[in-house]
Amino acid sequence: MKFGHYLCLSLAFSGILKCYSQGTLPVPVNLQATYIKGTRTTNGAPGKNYWQNRADYNIKVNFDPKSRLLSGTVAIDYVNNSPDTLKEVDFKLYPNLYKKGSIRSMPVLPEDIGDGVQISQMSINQQHQNESQWAIDGTNMTVKTPGVLPKQTVHFDITYSYILNKTSHIRTGQVDSGAFFIAYFFPRIAVYDDIDGWNQQHYTGVQEFYNDFCHFNAEITVPGNYEVWATGNLKNAGEIYSSTIAGRIAEAAKNDGVTDVITGQDLKDGNITQNKVANTWKFEADSVTDLAFAISNHYLWKASSLVVDPKSGRRSRVDAVFNANHKDYFAVINYARKTVETMSYQFPKWPYPYPHETVFDGLDQMEYPMMVNDNPLEKAEDAIELTDHEIFHTMFPFYMGTNETKYAWMDEGWATIGEWLISSVIDPKITDTFAIEGYEGSAGTENDPPIMTLSTLLEGGAYETNSYPKPGLGYLYIKDMLGDTLFNKGLHYYITQWHGKHPMPFDFFNCMNTGSGVNLNWFWKSWFFDNGIPDQSIGKVSIVQKQYTVSIFNNGTKAVPVDLVVFYSDGSTENIHKSIACWKDGNKKVTLSFTAKKRVQQLVLGGPFDADANRADNIWVAK
């Protein structure tokens, strides 16, 4: 694209901004183009020309636990809703993270490195393709096509296989000799969107995923002594399970209490499935971004359900599937159920959108649509915080369809605030401050770029703080300033406009502004776009009789709430709070006044969620 086109585009965009809210955010040129094309709007809603592509997947695979060979076919009907003719279709082969020669940002043991996904046959619209029609580069595969016209559907049939990793468990792989979590297991078409065209980012292990909303039918064949749990609804439970187990599943789906679906005695008796040789498990999921499954021949299964939408009476089932030797997992069903309940009724106060949430005892700390792969933990507090964090991802990214690869903060930041808020609901003794201390330690260093830095450019500590605590705190501070009613109006407007679609960061910022009716650009720019640190201090303290006047200074550039804790000599405390609104005008000082109820011993500035790069100047001691 030549400079002249950029100039015209920028002039056109400046015209749009003249009628936009006071104070605008710095929008990159490639994102400005979405406003010109009418695919997105400056009030946050999708534009009149918004489009996204979709596909129907029919997956049939066999998995052999002994050899770890997964083999099968995938049939795809891909709908091109874009205005472009697609001369090629790009695929993702995520198992190629373990392929020889692939680029990786996470370590993989030599014994797990192999030949990757083997494509033995491919056809397009029932026309056989030879190998010259496709090219594989790491986790990407490009397939030449005759040209898929706008509004046209193209059909792919692919026969493939690969060996699942035994160790080096990066979100998928063998858990133990009789348990496996199997994700990203089929060739899938990459996202083609109005911003980047084809998503050609390689999956290297750190940055996560970006997938279209699709319809899935999956048939998964495993030995007869294994059970399967997966994204979506099991369509043939009555054909596979014994009548006893099938009855317990039905009971769990309609009862608030916990049902022991598979017990230790059931495992001993071996009467869980009807066919003891092999079973084909059939799952269906609609309008989801991915499908994952897990299998085991020795796991217990606890299940419960609850009404997640009081208007319709719709229920969702919650599962904990686990190794009996992992004692912490016996309580995970309670943590998971309470998380789904809290999400539906308190935060984000949106009915849990899927038919089930299954927490599987694995070797990672990872989310998938309707599934979680969580390692066991010794402390109940840690198990609670991990469980609610991963389940919260149901909303972000899965319900909302965000690009995790480029904008990790758009899902991990939400899972972080979700964890902070829900953990104390599950156990009021918990004050969950996950990752805040790490941010305070790195704030202002070379390892602390702005949140809006693309996640693809980050790794290590910079990736972690930009994805988790920094955006989580930003959301928390806005929630505190707006109050729950206005905050929910903004957040629900964003969810309503964009669930099932692909929002970019500016869609979120603009939706929050529009939905809440408050221009928050001053904070978005400071917290998400600018460099700087959070750093407050206690300045002058004036005392006239029992009247205290305290100067609080913002020595940094990031707006943080003011929480002054007054410690009295009898051990009691009083908290004085101001939201980030007190810094809105760019002032560097605010003044707090209070009347002491008793003799003051000391003043301490900063609560557990008030990030501060230097807490040494946050204490004033009475003389």
Predicted segments — roles?
Residues 25-90:
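Early extracytoplasmic/domain-onset interaction patches
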Residues 193, 208-388, 417:
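Hydrophobic helix-coil surface modules that form long, contiguous segments used
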Residues 74-76, 80, 91-93, 152-166, ...:
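Short, hydrophobic/aromatic-enriched beta-strand segments in well-ordered soluble domains
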Residues 101-112, 161-216, 237, 306, ...:
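Glycine/proline-rich low-complexity spacer/linker segments in large multi-domain proteins
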Residues 229-230, 542-606:
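Beta-strand-rich binding/interaction modules
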Residues 28, 69, 79, 107-178, ...:
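A surface-exposed beta-strand-loop module
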Residues 21, 27-42, 54-55, 283, ...:
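Hydrophobic alpha-helical and helix-loop surface patches within well-folded domains
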Residues 86-129, 183, 221-226, 567-578:
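Solvent-exposed beta-hairpin/edge-strand motifs
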